[in-house]
Swiss-Prot record:
Family: Belongs to the transketolase family. DXPS subfamily.
Organism lineage string: Eukaryota, Viridiplantae, Streptophyta, Embryophyta, Tracheophyta
Coiled coil regions, renumbered to chain: none
InterPro entries on file: Dxylulose-5-P_synthase, THDP-binding, Transketo_C/PFOR_II, Transketolase-like_Pyr-bd, Transketolase_BS, Transketolase_C, Transketolase_CS
Residues involved in Mg(2+) binding: 218, 247
SMART domains per the UniProt record, alphabetical: Transket_pyr
Residues that hold thiamine diphosphate according to the record: 146, 187-189, 219-220, 247, 368, 450
Protein name: 1-deoxy-D-xylulose-5-phosphate synthase, chloroplastic
Cellular compartment(s): Plastid, Chloroplast stroma
Cofactor (UniProt): Mg(2+); thiamine diphosphate
Length: 717
């Protein structure tokens, strides 16, 4: 090869970013030389192209009346029931389809609530994917799944969109049982590259030739599993496509995203088209093959050819992905149908070996000005007025348990400088954005990285700080080994605040906090508690602050408090460890509730009192350690003891019966019954519908009590 034989335009490849002079060329040194023919057009980037294009899209939507309450006209979308109906459309028609699809998403979500911003950001990408690929033969995986609404509309579910996230309606995420076009169920983040790689390897082992596409982004690239999967994908070298949906919620240190040049527009289009050039890709494949088949000096030369090809093809920001073994293309304008179709078609048709990553830059909330200006507030929405963007939030006399937790933690931090808070990209969801505003240097957002969050908290505890790790109950599952090995085994005083405990309504089984009591209370050193109301939540935050010799956790539900008086100054009072309380004295039947289930027990007591049965209601407060004296007293003074919890088998009730059995309290006439969530997943729906399906309504508790004492119960239902 000749040294310095070819000069590349600097807008294609420069060290550290894109050149501001698009016509200036830069020569490769002798150590980075490769002879080939490449076009070198002199393109002038338009710094306003992105904003101009966005304005046109917004204007077209407004002109069609899509911001009003009535369903907007969608003549082209009305002809599309499944992806097969898109195949004969022109690119111009695909643009019209995208506009109409975006309008339909806005209209439908305004009526049901749901994840709006993420879905609006991938409209063009969704259209292009279904235009080029053929699901369900080809597999398209949507990471997290909250951006899947356009996908659902195009795959036969448009007529069911008014049922989104409602009882017996469509799931808010992809779900295998809902459609053959949903090849993998999601809800938690950063899983699709792993699953997609498994599908690709399975395809290869079975001799098939379908495509596998994993769409990931919207924060999911902050989780370690995504990089573990890419590392394995690069090693296995199986054909698959990873689409990085970069909507600025992804930790990607790409200079062009923050530099003076816009990351989208004519410049990136030319770069992306060049990078998908089959000749260059085949060059890399030849080099890759040489490195695997030859040794000695020729092996070293072939390795350099591969390295140079990667460098010239990839462009700025690709180093990480290329080092992991993924062929990088991008960045690509995720709202430019022409480019998306061209690149996806090229990638699909080019015979290659190994995984490809296409870096697509999108805008969250695209095409709806209210969502564009406040993508945080329009990530997940309740019902809203499309014309004004105003969300119809229910006016409640009480605040959410999430807010009460945050206020309690702020109150503790005001008087204790060692209190710190950690969350995994969920400042709003956990309430810690309130803590962040008050104590910006004592609140840590670690990204969607629950494993790191737990061990990071363990390290903070080692230094004498008092870390509160606020993670949804269902997301705590992702970091269980860290809870066991890094925290509990070492008796480090990390405090786990587990929001969304129990049934969670519209978010369904992926977010249901069913298992935390079971997997936390089995740990030898963990203190496990749950408040029955918002006042006790304040007290348990104070209790957790005071526990400095071992880890602790407390769970609390989604939804609002019941309206009890709060502690003065929002400052809770520590509870004696392992001490429950009697809320109502009665006879014959004792209802022992744990956490939010205590309120259902009180409701059942009212029903039973109307039928002449005065029962005892107790609030356990602690699952570990149990209030053994309280349980022993209830068991000895009542005919029936019913434990009630909004959790799975193996939780609070199991700990109670273990004690009852070992203490000999089951050897007499006592009748004990546990009431727990059924041993199956409960689908999304209204909270009351979910409780009814679970058999944990006050009427179910009352009926169980009546049945155990031999009284009729039919009138309860």
């Amino acid at each position: 090869m000749a040294s310095s034989a070819f000069a590349f335009p600097s807008y294609i490849i420069t060290k550290g970013g894109l050149s501001t002079d698009s016509c200036k060329s830069t020569s490769l040194s002798s150590s980075r030389s490769l002879v080939t023919d490449l076009p070198s057009p002199c393109l002038k980037p338009n710094n306003n192209s992105h904003s101009n294009r966005r304005a046109k899209v917004c204007a077209s939507l407004a002109e069609k009346g899509e911001y009003y309450s009535n369903r907007p006209p969608t003549p082209l979308l009305d002809t599309i029931n499944y992806p097969i109906h898109m195949k004969n459309l022109s690119v111009k028609e695909l643009k019209q389809l995208s506009d109409e699809l975006r309008s339909d998403v806005i209209f439908n979500v305004s009526k049901t609530g749901g994840h709006l911003g993420s879905s609006l950001g991938v409209v063009e990408l969704t259209v292009a994917l279904h235009y080029i690929f053929n699901t369900p033969q080809d597999k398209i995986l949507w990471d997290v799944g909250h951006q899947s609404y356009p996908h659902k509309i195009l795959t036969g579910r448009r007529g069911k969109m008014p049922t989104m996230r409602q009882t017996n309606g469509l799931s808010g995420f992809t779900k295998r049982g809902e459609s053959e076009h949903d090849c993998f169920g999601t809800g938690h983040s950063s899983t699709t590259i792993s699953a997609g790689l498994g599908m690709a390897v399975g395809r290869d082992l079975k001799g098939k030739n379908n495509n596998v596409v994993a769409v990931i982004g919207d924060g999911a690239m902050t989780a370690g599993q995504a990089y573990e999967a890419m590392n394995n994908a690069g090693y296995l070298d199986s054909d698959m496509i990873v689409i990085l949906n970069d909507n600025k919620q992804v930790s990607l240190p790409t200079a062009t995203l923050d530099g003076p040049s816009p990351p989208v527009g004519a410049l990136s289009s030319a770069l992306s088209r060049l990078q998908s050039n089959p000749a260059l890709r085949e060059l890399r494949e030849v080099a890759k093959g040489m490195t695997k088949q030859i040794g000695g000096p020729m092996h070293q030369l072939a390795a350099k050819v591969d390295e140079y090809a990667r460098g010239m093809i990839s462009g700025t920001g690709s180093s990480l992905f290329e080092e992991l073994g993924l062929y990088y293309i991008g960045p690509v304008d995720g709202h430019n149908i022409d480019d998306l179709v061209a690149i996806l078609k090229e990638v699909k048709s080019t015979r290659t070996t190994g995984p490809v990553l296409i870096h697509v830059v999108t805008e969250k909330g695209r095409g709806y000005p209210y969502a564009e200006r406040a993508d945080d507030k329009y990530h997940g929405v309740v019902k809203f007025d499309p014309a004004t963007g105003r969300q119809f939030k229910t006016t409640n006399k009480t605040q959410s348990y999430t807010t009460y937790f945050a206020e309690a933690l702020v109150a503790e931090a005001e008087v204790d400088k060692d209190v710190v808070a950690i969350h995994a990209a969920m400042g709003g969801g956990t309430g810690l954005n309130l803590f962040q505003r008050r104590f910006p240097t004592r609140c840590f957002d670690v990204g969607i990285a629950e494993q790191h969050a737990v061990t990071f908290a363990a390290g903070l505890a080692c230094e004498g700080l008092k870390p509160f790790c606020a993670i949804y109950s269902s997301f705590m599952q992702r970091a269980y080994d860290q809870v066991v090995h890094d925290v509990d085994l070492q008796k480090l005083p990390v405090r786990f605040a587990m929001d969304r405990a129990g049934l969670v309504g519209a978010d369904g089984p992926t977010h249901c906090g069913a298992f935390d009591v079971t997997f936390m209370a089995c740990l030898p050193n963990m203190i496990v508690m749950a408040p029955s109301d918002e006042a006790d939540l304040f007290n348990m935050v104070a209790t957790a602050v005071a526990i400095d010799d071992r880890p602790s956790c407390f769970r609390y539900p989604r939804g609002n408090g019941i309206g009890v008086a709060l502690p003065p100054g929002n400052k809770g009072v520590p509870i004696e460890i392992g001490k429950g309380r009697i809320l109502k004295e009665g006879e014959r039947v004792a209802l022992l509730g744990y956490g939010s289930a205590v309120q259902s027990c009180l409701g059942a007591a009212v029903m039973l009192e109307e039928r002449g049965l005065n029962v005892t209601v107790a609030d356990a407060r602690f699952c570990k350690p149990l209030d053994r004296a309280l349980i022993r007293s209830l068991a000895k003074s009542h005919e029936v003891l019913i434990t009630v919890e909004e959790g799975s088998i193996g939780g609070f009730g199991s700990h109670v019966v273990q004690f009852l059995a070992l203490d000999g309290l089951l050897d007499g006439k006592l009748k004990w019954r546990p009431m727990v969530l059924p041993d199956r997943y409960i689908d999304h729906g209204a909270p009351a519908d979910q409780l009814a399906e679970a058999g944990l309504m006050p009427s179910h508790i009352a009926a169980t009590a009546l049945n155990l004492i031999g009284a009729p119960r039919e009138a309860l239902f």
